Amino acid sequence: MEPTKLYPIVAVLSLVTVEYGGWALLSFVSARRGQLDDFQTQFFRAGHAHAGVLLVLSLVYFLYLGSKTDFAESTQWIAGAILLTGVLAQSGGFFLHLAVGEVGRGSPGTRLTRSGALLIATALVLLAVGIART
């Protein structure tokens, strides 16, 4: 199976987990009203929102990767892996910071979020180069 077919499947199935996470978060917040502080609420929302938006945007990325570039299949595999790893790292970093971070201080979670952003940027630049080359 080609990367531009498999990776979108992974992204769509991942969106199902994000939807479930949203439902679970809403249930958690509703049932435990007042038990989450502003810090926890903000990072829950940020992680969840980044995951959903970036996964939807990854679907557009894979359309362009497959139809607007002449990259070899191996390059498509690498580009897709970089993108999805970045999406997971950026959104996951918010949840990690929620678990181990402190208000106003850096943590492994904030470093993971930044690393994810760099991976996503790398994948986007790679796609732009591929589009420009064709």
Where are the model-predicted features located?
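Polytopic transmembrane helical bundles with strong interfacial aromatic enrichment
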Residues: 1-134
